[in-house]
Amino acid sequence: MLKLKEGFNGERTIVLSKIIVDLLDKDPLASMLHITDIGYYPKAEHHYIERKEAINQYVFIYCMDGCGWYCINGNRYEVQANQYFILPAGIPHTYAADVNNPWTIYWIHFKGELAPLYAQNALHPMSINPEAHSRIGYRINLFEEIFHTLKNGYKTENLQYVSSLFHHYLGSLRYIQQFREANNDSINDNNAIETAIHYMKENVERRLTLKEI
């Protein structure tokens, strides 16, 4: 079976150099939580990663469409659309796209003193169900802002801003109920058209059926 680490049509990735990562490890703000690698893989057919040697970063994967799976500590987990998981640092693992319905994923490698807090309870697949107040589009925009800020260069202000954004990004998942309730007045649940439009925006990565809408 063909196994690919990268090279997918439409992929986007940024890998920070060791020099930059070492600077982040020592930065008063960024050392608390910072990104080392970030990317987006659409329809990642044959995607397969096996790490027999543990790495010192946490691995965040957010499946927007399709399916996949991962193995860690002898356990295998299936991942569906609108689910994410975080693999802890220091433990060998394997993950891959489904053969018949490969996933579309946003992924981030990260580390820092607060990394264990944000990764807590996310070893199992965590669902982010699209609904009136799910704010999935907002979170995607946060990812894009992080990505483009890094793409604009690695000066200290950029790196510290990315660290601040990433706190917000992971916080929107770790404290998902609070994240949703903070903006629960913006959508009128009784307006069917408004709700349908919002649902389509929250599922921009997927091909929705009329029944789902």
Q: What feature does the model see in each segment?
A:
Residues M1-H34, R51, I128, T149, ...:
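A short, N-terminal "cap"/entry segment at the start of jelly-roll beta-barrel domains
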